[in-house]
Structure formats: structure tokens, C-alpha cells
Amino acid sequence: MKYLQALIVVLIFSSCEKDEIPVAYIAPELQQGTFITQIEMSSDYRYRTYYDLETDMVVARHRKRDWDLGFSSVEGDQRIRLNSSRLMSVYRIDGVPFEDIGSVQGEGPLYDRADGTEAALDDWQSGDGVYVINRGYDAEVNDMGKVKVELQSMDATGFTLRYAVLGSSDIQEVFVPKDETVNMVMLSFDEGVQNLEPPKEDWDILFTHYTLFFDELFGQQNIQYLVAGALINPYQVEAQDLDLTEFDDIDVDYLQGVDLTSEEDVIGYDWKEFTLIGESYAILDNAYAIRTVEGNDYKFQFTNFLDENGERGAPTFQAALVD
């Protein structure tokens, strides 16, 4: 990331009613010219908000506390993701029966990488598949507790596992089905299987809190931060941070020389920085190229992070189709 000073440890949350707002997908009628949009994440970043560039619409939104694990729906893919918007982590345990685990132990803490290249649970089929999972923090900064999980099997139809609150003998068994229309199906340790993510063909950008992990930073080992930013859809979306930040100068000819990437945090968080003077946010020079699920190229630039009342968590951007 370009601006380490932009790292912000954000653990200030508040509760709200469960709010999912699926919006029916409409075949995109591409806008001509520049459009300006503001996304409401809320000042405590309680929401994970899915946005589609072609329609300039929020297609779904849910609270970050609504799920714990995300199970890949890609055919043959065994990946299981943590809910990175809660600073979750795991400890891998080998050689200890599931029923005997009563405390945090094993190799860890392990985290998912924000770029999507590695997940803490990636090797679950190579060992015993037993983990202690730290569920992180809810919207009010309450510790959501810890569970032990045994990931048992995966086939073409889904995943089988069992879990229990750490220290409890009440073991829950669950099957999480694959759904080819989405990237992943979620599981809440409180509410069971959750269908929260919109169809993978319907969105391009996820505005959310997410965990940023460093093996080493400023001489400290294994540093984790919660940051507020934008992640791209791992299904077919590509993007790149541009050297040219004059929005009007970004055209087809310029983008032909840009190499796009599928790293999910390529847009990320560091288009802004926190300023101690006034305790506010400054927008840094930024511009991005984004190729959508449909294969259309857009130029994209953040212009603000505050709402009309000066509250954070309301990223505003301008975007335009480049053709």
C-alpha cells in the first residue's frame, strides 16, 4: 500500500436493525458521460455494500455481523473465507480430538489476505480440519467470542462441518450448499446458513471494512488493522491504480497501456488519509481503471469520504464509461 500513514485502526461500531436490501438486476443501459455517486457505509462501517457500475446502483447490503464464514460456490473450490470486516482470525489444531478442545491453542493467529490470494483456512483438507475461530467484534465492539470448528468434507454440492462455542458441549452440525450464482454462501454461527451475497454477475465493487494484515510493520510482527475501503468482485472484475489522476485525461488510448489485476484490494483504502488536525479525512490523488463483470471499462475516482454532516463512511466518487 502506498500510504502507511493512512492506516487507521477502527474499532468503533454501533448496532442497527438487520438490513438486507436486494435489488432486482436490470440489464445495464450504459450511462454516457461522468456520473457522481455516494455510498452510505455508515460512520461506524456497519454495512457491507455491493455496488454495480453499469446501473449505478447498490444491489445488496448487509451488516458485517450477519455472518462468520463464507464457503466458495466455485465448482471444485474448497476455499472458506473469514468475515474480514470483523478482524476475525483462526488457530489451526492438529492431533487433538475435536471434543477435547476447550481453549485457544494451535498455530495462529492466522488471517485472510485482503487481496484474496490466501485464506487462513486454505489447507483445511490437508490436516485434521480442526480450528479455533476468533469471531472478532460486533458493531458495538463486543467480543463475539470463539468457536471450535471441524471442517469435515466437501463435494460438488457443498460443505459439511460441525462447530461449538468454545467451552460448550453443544455441538452443531451443518451442511452449507454451493450455489453457482454467487461467489460464496455464508454461515453464521448464530443463525445458520445465510444467503447474503448478491448474484456474482450483478456487482463490481464491495464497500466495506476489512482486515489488513502485515507480517511486519514498524518493527512489529503480525500487525492487523481494520480499514474502510473498496474491494472488487473476484468474479471477472479487474482494476488498476492509475498514475494519471487527471480524470478528464483518462481515455481509451491511455487505458490500452494499463495492466489490470484481479487482486481484490487493488482499489483498497489508501485513497484517503486521516488528518489529526480537525480529526477528518483528506482525499489523496487517486484514479482507477475498472473492468466490470460485463467487460466494460470505466475510469473511477474518489472525491470525498464524508457526508453532508461531516460524518465519515460516505465515500463519494465520480466514474465514466471509457469507450
Locate the predicted segments by residue.
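Sec-dependent signal peptide recognition
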Residues: M1-V9
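C-terminal motif of bacterial Sec signal peptides marking the signal peptidase cleavage site
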Residues: I12-S15
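Surface-exposed, beta-sheet-biased, low-hydrophobicity segments with strongly acidic/polar composition
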Residues: E17-D323
